[in-house]
């Protein structure tokens, strides 16, 4: 949230890509998720990049934007359509983008980004039906007292519904 209108600046988007490219070679033997704004076709998307063993595996874009109260994500980003998958051509690379599921050595990983987890028809339900083993939820929001406990309870309840387990 700290970038606010700077999300729209091409320089910020370019710097985010440069930082991702700088991180990539340091992920050998690791699976790493990195958040960044992604320009695709005519829109800007709030995305999570999954980097696996030094290589960008793909980008998952947020499907539900927070737009009430102090949240105004629609000012900067577009919501990604559920089920849509595409390819982003960037710097000579073809990068999978969209509503993706990743297979990392037999472990299936999916994402729902922040607000995606707070809606009734959350992407996690569809990802569970697609057989994900691990559901990642990168989140950032304003400060509130005891918010960490609210998030923990929320994740535990969602895990129970999906027959998954949370270890903390």
Can you describe what each PLM-predicted range is?
Residues 1-168:
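Enzyme catalytic cores with a strong preference for nitrogen-chemistry domains
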């Amino acid at each position: 949230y700290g970038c606010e209108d700077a999300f729209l600046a091409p320089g910020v988007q370019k710097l985010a890509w440069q930082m991702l490219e700088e991180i990539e070679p340091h992920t050998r033997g690791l699976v790493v998720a990195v958040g960044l704004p992604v320009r695709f076709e005519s829109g800007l998307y709030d995305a999570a990049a999954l980097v696996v063993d030094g290589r960008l595996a793909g980008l998952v874009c947020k499907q539900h934007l927070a737009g009430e109260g102090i949240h105004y994500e629609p000012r900067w980003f577009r919501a990604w359509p559920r089920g849509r998958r595409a390819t982003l051509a960037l710097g000579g690379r073809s990068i999978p983008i969209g509503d993706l599921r990743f297979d990392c050595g037999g472990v299936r990983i999916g994402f729902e980004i922040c607000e995606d987890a707070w809606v009734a028809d959350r992407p996690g339900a569809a990802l569970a039906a697609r057989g994900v083993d691990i559901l990642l939820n990168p989140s950032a929001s304003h400060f509130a007292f005891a918010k960490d406990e609210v998030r923990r309870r929320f994740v535990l309840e969602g895990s129970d519904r999906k027959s998954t387990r949370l270890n903390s």
